[in-house]
């Protein structure tokens, strides 16, 4: 039962109404508060906006629109910024080690300002991959009325009649190395892949997490698919004031929404849409912050009864803007509900349940081919497969859409860093039929568990994407496609079996039986383990050093507050 709250400023009044806090009040009056403002609820508006990348460059504008809506709704909106890392910019460089780290820095910084300044509620305006889980972790920790606004997806780029996206630019390098693209066309792809503001446009990590969070009920409906520069996105920001006041009046908090059943809804949606492997660790981390027990095995359990239906990039042909045109996530959720695969009684930030929200949505159109028919799916079960075996006794995450097959066996080609594998690919070291092993790039080994999009994109561009497999204790971008297995746990730096693999060892990847193993004898394992020496840490000070000391394994969500 939802109780109507009569004290909407019950947190901020510690500063605004307490006569023993004159200095607090003096500073607030100095910042422009009126006597009436001191009685109103204070809503923090946290933006990850910053210049120089398409995912985040417009977020401060959206945050300004949110602030206006909050003010008109009878509250005080206080804007603040936190950081972000552009995966697209840092990918393939040492800078990528800071990407996953940024998730926890975002969460910590939002928690810090909201706790220190006694905000009654929170709106987060976020864009790139780690922004969303960082914001949700903070919301769960704070447990004050909260809404996330997704910055929105980018529109497609175009060059010589071809639709482009950010992965087009990554894969163009492989084509250049292979000699299948001219320098002029290479530059043409680069300069036309990203036409303006918005997050990377396929079912990559940003759009995956936005879809998951909308399915959980922490955004307004259609937030995940509305393009960044659309009128629909602007309308979303202008609706925030009314929505937030309703949450405050009903005292609906994130943990009322972030139930185990809500996480199951989120997983179901990203599986049917073909979402990123990163969703596994991010949802586990968010669940931990919310006090919900979620494990990698829950993804497998749900995936066993969830078909892959969406023909979205990276493995398909459509973009998120196309998903928006056919009804967005609510229409997909209506389809799942018809097959009794959703929990419809979960609460959302609209103040209504999932089921009540879906009554206002439309069914998917019959004249579209983005979403396959239920009876004729792309894959009968989920594309995110949890593999175990002697290479991953604590689990790993494979992204198998079915287009690349379900079984691969071949000799290992081992690299101890992403830089080494990229050089090897550009030098044509990798041969058809091999399993590329990239290790010492896990959460502690990286440190920071960087994404391996550059090598997988090079493989695709070289024409080896369907002829090789790639396994790693690092991560993959949502833009990765091909026969790939990541999040191998334990990681090499922690003595994991992946650190003992040698060139030529036969590696077996069986997505049907969910097995990841290297075919060597126990005697050989014992011999190699005795000879193994833990490498020196790659960070000895600063944020990467702190992260390396605190971070948990990939299977546990890479959290830093265990």
UniProtKB/Swiss-Prot annotation:
Organism field: Cytophaga hutchinsonii (strain ATCC 33406 / DSM 1761 / CIP 103989 / NBRC 15051 / NCIMB 9469 / D465)
Function of the protein: Functions in the biosynthesis of branched-chain amino acids. Catalyzes the dehydration of (2R,3R)-2,3-dihydroxy-3-methylpentanoate (2,3-dihydroxy-3-methylvalerate) into 2-oxo-3-methylpentanoate (2-oxo-3-methylvalerate) and of (2R)-2,3-dihydroxy-3-methylbutanoate (2,3-dihydroxyisovalerate) into 2-oxo-3-methylbutanoate (2-oxoisovalerate), the penultimate precursor to L-isoleucine and L-valine, respectively.
Active site: 477
Keyword Acetylation among record annotations: no
Cofactor-binding details, from the entry: Binds 1 [2Fe-2S] cluster per subunit. This cluster acts as a Lewis acid cofactor.
PROSITE patterns given in the database record: ILVD_EDD_1 (PS00886), ILVD_EDD_2 (PS00887)
Organism lineage string: Bacteria, Pseudomonadati, Bacteroidota, Cytophagia, Cytophagales
UniProt subunit comment: Homodimer.
A UniProt-annotated Pfam family: ILV_EDD_C
Cofactor(s) of this protein: [2Fe-2S] cluster; Mg(2+)
Protein's name according to its UniProt entry: Dihydroxy-acid dehydratase
Keyword flag Ubl conjugation: no
């Amino acid at each position: 039962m939802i109780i109507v709250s009569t004290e909407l400023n019950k947190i901020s009044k510690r500063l605004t109404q307490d006569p023993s806090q004159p200095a607090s009040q003096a500073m607030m009056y100095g910042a422009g508060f009126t006597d009436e403002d001191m009685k109103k609820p204070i809503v923090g508006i946290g933006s990850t906006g910053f210049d120089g990348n398409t995912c985040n460059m417009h977020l401060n504008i959206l945050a300004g629109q949110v602030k206006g809506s909050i003010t008109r709704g009878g509250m005080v909106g206080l804007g603040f910024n936190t950081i972000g890392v552009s995966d697209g910019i840092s990918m393939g460089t040492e800078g990528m080690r800071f990407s996953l780290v940024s998730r926890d820095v975002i969460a910590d910084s939002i928690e810090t300002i909201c706790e220190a300044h006694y905000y009654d509620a929170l709106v987060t305006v976020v864009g790139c991959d780690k922004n969303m889980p960082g914001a949700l972790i903070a919301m769960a920790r704070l447990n004050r009325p909260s809404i996330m606004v997704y910055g929105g997806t980018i529109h497609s780029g175009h060059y010589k009649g071809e639709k482009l996206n950010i992965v087009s630019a990554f894969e163009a390098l492989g084509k250049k190395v292979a000699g299948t693209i001219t320098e002029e066309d290479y530059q043409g792809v680069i300069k036309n892949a990203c036409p303006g503001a918005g997050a990377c446009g396929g079912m990559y990590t940003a759009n995956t997490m936005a879809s998951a969070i909308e399915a959980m009920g922490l955004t307004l409906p259609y937030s995940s698919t509305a393009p960044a520069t659309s009128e629909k996105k602007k309308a979303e920001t202008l609706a925030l004031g009314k929505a937030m006041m309703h949450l405050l009046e009903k005292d609906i908090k994130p943990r009322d929404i972030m139930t185990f059943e809500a996480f199951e809804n989120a997983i179901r949606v990203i599986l049917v849409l073909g979402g990123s492997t990163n969703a596994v660790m991010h949802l586990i981390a968010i669940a931990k912050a919310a006090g919900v027990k979620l494990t990698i095995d829950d993804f497998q359990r749900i995936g066993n009864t969830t078909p892959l239906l969406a023909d979205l990039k990276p493995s398909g042909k459509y973009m998120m803007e196309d998903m928006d045109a056919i009804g967005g996530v609510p229409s997909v959720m209506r389809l799942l509900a018809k097959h009794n695969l959703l929990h419809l009684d979960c609460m959302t930030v609209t103040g209504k349940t999932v089921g009540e929200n879906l009554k206002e949505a439309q069914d998917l159109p019959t004249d579209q081919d983005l979403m396959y028919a239920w009876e004729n799916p792309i894959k009968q079960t989920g594309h995110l497969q949890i593999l175990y075996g002697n290479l991953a006794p604590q689990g790993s995450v494979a992204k198998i859409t079915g287009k690349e097959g379900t079984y691969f066996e071949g000799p290992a080609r081992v690299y101890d860093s992403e830089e080494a594998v990229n050089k090897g690919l550009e030098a044509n070291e990798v041969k058809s039929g091999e399993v590329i092993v990239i290790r010492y790039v896990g959460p502690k080994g990286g440190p920071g568990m960087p994404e391996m999009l550059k090598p997988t994109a090079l493989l695709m561009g070289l024409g080896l994407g369907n002829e090789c497999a790639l396994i790693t204790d690092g991560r993959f971008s949502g833009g990765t496609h091909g026969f790939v297995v990541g999040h191998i746990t334990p990681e090499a730096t922690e003595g994991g079996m992946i650190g003992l693999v040698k060139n030529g060892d036969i590696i077996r990847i069986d997505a049907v039986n969910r097995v990841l193993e290297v075919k060597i004898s126990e005697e050989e394992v014992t011999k190699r383990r005795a000879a193994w020496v833990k490498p020196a840490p790659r960070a000895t000070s600063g944020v990467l050093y702190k992260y390396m000391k605190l971070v948990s394994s990939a299977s546990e969500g890479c959290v830093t507050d265990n």
